Amino acid sequence: KRLKSNFHMQIKRVVVTGLGALTPIGNNIQEYWSGLVNGVSGAAPITYFDATKFKTRFACELKNFNVTDFIDRKEARKMDRFTQYAMVATDEAIADSGLNSEDHNPDRIGVIWGSGIGGLETFQNEVLNFAAGDGSPRFNPFFIPKMIADIAPGQISIKHGFRGPNFATVSACASSSNAIIDSLNYIRLGQADAIVTGGSEAAVTIAGMGGFNAMHALSTRNDSPETASRPFDKDREGFVLGEGAGALILEEYEHAKARGAKIYAEVIGGGMSSDAHHITAPHPEGLGAKNVMLNCLRDAGIKPEDVDAINMHGTSTPLGDIAESKAILDVFGNHAYNININSTKSMTGHLLGAAGAIEAIASILAINNSEVPPTINHFTDDDQIDNKLNFTFNKAQKREVNIAISN
């Protein structure tokens, strides 16, 4: 027999009430937006380690960042860099939102955080230390707690006293986008009043650079790092690795309105998909990208022609950019030519598990400022990409943005 239920669900509206960013082109929201609209490249020679023998000797590192300006030195030593970045970005977002556990029910505030790799530097250093020793298993007691991806949302909740849903999403470059969608749905279904969400990554390490070089995924344009990330350009030849964090406060609309919160935007839908094709290469016709955008539009209850701007995944890889641009034409048809399309990875590099968060923030800021950041470093059209599409090449464009998608 089927069980009867008196449960009637009312889907709640979800808004963004706080933002925080720590990126290669700015260490807070104001600096990040300035870097975006001014077309600043975050790429430069690697300073974290001697990269002389690496195929790629540059990356998008953070600039002028000292963790002890934000976190006590003793506490910082217990955290991998990806967690440190998460703490800094979420502190900014929480302060921006005015949300706290003293004035609001902490059992109804959660943390859902994305990271594609987690504590890679911690893992790398512990293994290197072991390999250099006599075989005795001398490991730091913080090795595992520093390394696991779920430690970032754990540390955030401990600091701020948030006792709602708490977990990490690990889905490679989609990690923080998935975290945002999970947060959206938890609030929609009434399981939380607010959720701190986003993602962080700190993979500019010996292991990170070496591993991605072995995959032939990275640009090797060592003579001109600042022009290496060039999405949709004919001469693109790989992505540029970045690092940092992006944080958003998602909140139930009535809860935000009741406390007089500043509202940046409403999150009206999210889509997820897999192309079930290959471990690294995209489906040649962009099937995964096509399905995820269709799912997003369906979930949001809007039509393709309602969309004004799309911040593409746009990694500057030979196959990926072609596949994603095909998907946009398939989904949006002739309306695709009316949309401002861009890739902020041309400036920030690819932040892996944090990419979705900082790019969602860029889309939100585009709505608030009526300006779409550029896709920099375009020099030569690629005849395999429809260049009648407006990729917002090289210079930001002013326009009204009511609905934006972040891929």
Question: What are the functions of these language-model segments?
Answer:
Residues N6-V16, D103-P106, A300-D306, Y337, ...:
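Flexible, low-complexity linker/loop segments at domain and module junctions
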Residues R13-T17, A44, D223-A300, A309, ...:
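Condensing-enzyme catalytic core mediating Claisen C-C bond formation in acyl metabolism
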Residues V16, E31-W33, V37-S171, S200-M209, ...:
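Conserved beta-ketoacyl condensing-enzyme motif
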Residues Q30-G35, E121-S136, Y186-L189, M209-N222, ...:
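A glycine- and small-aliphatic-rich helix-loop capping segment at beta-alpha/alpha-beta transitions
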Residues A86-L99, A152-P153, S157-H160, P165-E201, ...:
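Active-site-proximal alpha-helical scaffold in enzymes
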Residues G133-N140, I181, N185, E201-A258, ...:
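Glycine-/small-residue-rich "gating" segment that lines the acyl/pantetheine channel
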Residues F139-I144, G164-S171, D233-E237, I339-H350, ...:
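Short pre-catalytic strand/loop immediately N-terminal to key active-site residues, enriched for Gly-Thr
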Residues Q191-E237, G270-P284, G314-D321, N338-N390:
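Acyl-CoA/ACP chain-elongation machinery
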